[in-house]
Regions:
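A charged, aromatic-enriched C-terminal amphipathic alpha-helix characteristic of glycosyltransferases
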Residues: 113, 129-160
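Conserved acidic donor-binding segment of nucleotide-sugar-dependent glycosyltransferases
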Residues: 105-116, 124-129
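Nucleotide-activated donor-binding/catalytic signature segment of Leloir-type glycosyltransferases, i.e.
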Residues: 25-55
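Short hydrophobic beta-strand element within catalytic cores of glycosyltransferases
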Residues: 90-93
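Short alpha-helical segment that forms part of, or immediately flanks, the ligand-binding pocket
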Residues: 58, 81-86, 100-101
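Short glycine/acidic-rich beta->alpha loop that forms part of the nucleotide-sugar donor binding site
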Residues: 75-78, 85, 95-96
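Active-site donor-sugar recognition loop in glycosyltransferases
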Residues: 56, 72-76, 98
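Acidic donor-binding loop of glycosyltransferase active sites
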Residues: 62-76
Length: 160
């Protein structure tokens, strides 16, 4: 349903079982089935790439209009959604695990209750420049997150 709403859309997936370490081994079979299906959908704008180094991935995320991440019930933090938010990219997520803590619904993205809402909100964010700009601006103005190197220096001073 998302692709027909805008034929210029691309869904770039940078993933593989290596992305998730030991957790990835546990889910290797399922993730490989999903990625195999996704690779067959290239004509619908879906591109599957191998995992990237962190800095390279950040550059790809910054180029994105929206960050889509359904999440899982056992999600306890969701670093990828947090990183997208810090990079100023609005997210569309499902209300699993910690997603509602990562994304402020209707302010920095959408937290959806089911697949139907996920599709609807994704289309809205992709096609509505005003809503996208509002969410992007909220992310930028509230971006007071420190880099890890700065946090480490603060802790070094405290521990001296």
């Amino acid at each position: 349903e998302i692709y027909p709403s805008n034929k210029n859309l691309k869904l770039n997936i940078y993933s593989g079982s290596l992305t998730y370490g030991k957790f990835g081994k546990k889910h290797f079979k399922n993730s490989e089935i999903i990625l195999k299906k996704a690779k067959r959908l290239k004509s619908f704008g879906i591109n599957v790439f191998s995992p990237l180094k962190r800095n390279e991935l950040f550059n790809k995320i910054k180029e994105s209009r929206v960050f889509l991440y359904k999440g899982t019930k056992d999600e306890t933090f969701c670093m990828s959604a947090a990183e997208a938010q810090v990079l100023g990219v609005p997210c569309v997520v499902c209300n699993y695990g910690s997603m509602q803590e990562r994304v402020r619904n209707n302010q920095t993205g959408f937290v959806c209750q089911d697949d139907k809402e996920f599709v609807k909100k994704t289309i809205k964010l992709l096609n509505d420049d005003d809503i996208w700009m509002k969410m992007h601006s909220n992310l930028i103005k509230n971006n007071n997150h420190l880099k890890w190197s700065k946090v480490a220096k603060i802790w070094q001073k405290i521990l001296k």
